[in-house]
Amino acid sequence: MIDSVSLNRLSGVRQMLRTFGGLNEGYACSEAELTAEKNFSSREFPALVTRKPRAKVRAIPKLNGSYHLNGMFTVEGTSIRYEAEGGAVTTLPNAVTDSEKQLVGIGTKILIWPDKKAFDTATRTVSNLGAAWTSGTGTVEISPCDSAGKTYTVARYGRTEPIDPKDGQMFLKVASMDSPWQSSSLLEVYNAAQEKWVILTLDYCKITATGIGKLFQSSDTITLSGTAAGEADQWEALDGECSLIEVHDNWILTRATPGGTRFYGKLTHTGSTAKWVSLNGNDIVECGSGYAVRLERKIPDLDYLTECDNRVWGCASKENVVYACKLGDPTNWYDYRGIASDSYAVTLGSEGAFTGAATCLGYVLFFKENCIHKLYGTKPSDYQVAGIRCAGVASGANKSLRVMNEVLFYLSLDGVMVWDGSLPQSVSASLKAEKLARVVRATGGTLGERYYLYTTTAANEQRLLVYDTTRGIWHEEDAIGQEMCSTGRQLYLWDGRILWAADPDREETDRETDTVDYELCTGDIGLDTPDDKYLSRVNVRLDALETGVVSLWVSYDGGAWEEAGHAQADEKYTRLNLPFAPARCDTLRLRLTGHGQIALRSIAMTVAAAGGNRVALSVKA
């Protein structure tokens, strides 16, 4: 039998939350997690603290790219600025075009695309990766020569050698008197000491012109074009790609396969005209006009870049090709000589544009939205590219690629992913997928054990999400980070006008800091008790780390926010209590707002449950 005392008896249970999770935008957000927040951090876990104030570094009206290599490198409009770790600053105005850059480091150099330039952090100079030279109105002489670059003339030719030759005498032994200058003839020199004729092999080509070699260096692979060698029928194929054996200011040496009916002679270009003269000077062939000799060290157009094993790797969506530069030499991308230091290129069969490139665990990775291409091997002869269909990098999110603790983080169409050498896995289950799917641009950065991800949508909705990789917790900070640069010791974020340092304690000099405006909303409190109950008392306990006012708000059963109280800290490191007696409800949510620095220590709740089963009671008639 139920009496009136038992029917209305309340049993109180005191509950306390002392371990706080992070952002959970899903339907299953618990009371210890946050449905929404701004500027909180898990750095003092299990307590919930506000992020550190950011240190103002300097104003930058336009930032097209940033990179850290022995110092901070920034592309600001058309200017380059480099601040070495020792503090010396170098500024180079009008060094590049005013466009967004793709940057990668190799050795002491920072490579800049699409400008195809390199900044040397040692010499503080900018140079072009590619080079081109054109003859213009000048004179260019092209002659067959030996490996030392020596050219020869000959006075006599015939089917048989002279009877009484002198030491060093030259002779061209021909197969046909009608075509004496063809490549099948043999150029010979008499050696008196050996008393025999020695054959000279002219399988090199010497190109002489004023200033022709100033832009190039030995071992460069260049593209030679605009010669009259084809019309003169000299060499098997002179125009095309060739490797420079020796380079001087006014002449260069390259290999060239002998061929043609007028091989033994000199080809001279003067302006746009050309003529061929035989080795004895007697036969002359006018080759017409319209020629312009050009030498070019070509650099491919690349969308995304990465460095691995002393090579720069890149991908080009227009060609669907992956490139690698010559070993240790980012100025040469078309050097194919069959050796281990060769350049490398391969066409991929997957559809779609490239969306990013990265290096992780010693592998070069190229991304599309729906696949990852992984490169195996140690040299061009055994390189292999394997593709797997999985969640790749989302379009516009190439700068979200960041490696931390040998794990690669990036934004995909399926959310934020981590790649550890196998298949990518999502770490963004607690974030709303619809928001991430609307992202059109994303950048990433790292600091300590935290991964920072800035996102923006077509409607200019901006967010800065921070993932604690140790605890698997997400937080959200006020949205800056259109450009980020991680140095290992610091993370720099650009808000469109000002460059900020994420952690002022890591800066060597005191800087002006921003004011942290914070806000958090808890999940529904009361869902863990499905029976009749009410909360008789709630006490929020926190530490104010600096002076300020903290406001507490409450929402009953999903209703409007009502202010439940506020507290003021007149001194630093003040412990504050915000108690209140909530109205009768099934569930409630709490909200904290303010500015400054606080640490949420605990939320204590006294829950009373009705003991008489009033709701379930049935009465017989």
Where are these regions (language model features)?
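Beta-sheet repeat architectures centered on beta-propellers
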Residues: 1-70, 392-396, 403-407, 414-621
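Short loop/turn segments that connect beta-strands within the blades of beta-propeller domains
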Residues: 76-77, 106-107, 113-115, 183, ...
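Beta-propeller and closely related beta-pinwheel folds
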Residues: 53, 296-443
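Short hydrophobic/aromatic-rich beta-strand motifs
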Residues: 72-74, 108-112, 162-189, 219-225, ...
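Extended assembly-interface regions of large multimeric machines
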Residues: 1-218, 230-236
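Surface-exposed loop/turn elements that mediate protein-protein interactions on large endomembrane-trafficking
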Residues: 79-91, 119-131, 322-343, 375-383, ...
